[in-house]
Amino acid sequence: MSKLEALKFILLLGAVYYAIGGIAHYFGLTIFPFFVSELYVPYQDSIIALVCLIFVLLLLAVARDPIKNVDTLNVLILGVALASVFSILIIYKIDLASLGAPAKKLQTITEGIMGFIYLGLLLWLHPRRKI
């Protein structure tokens, strides 16, 4: 598998991840075993689902031709970096235990670490432009 094929696969994998996350948020489903229904807020989770849908569309568009769409790939990389940082910052901003969801801390850490691993893969597989 070439580096470009690997990048396309990783982009498609990201689209699947965000599609599953968007569906879970929109319908109030759980992916992790420690779902806390009190944290489900239809309005906010619908906004998260919309953001996931936008990410899915961008990932799929870039996966078709990452070299041609390198500028959009760069925007996606920045978006993944921001999402990963925000996942970690949530731990410090929100007292999940006081909301009755202490196990959400582990979920949030897991999501942040997965995001940073995904970010690393995108950076490693990035098709550098030759000027």
Feature map (PLM): residue ranges:
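Cytosolic juxtamembrane helix and N-cap/initiation of the first transmembrane helix
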Residues: 1-17
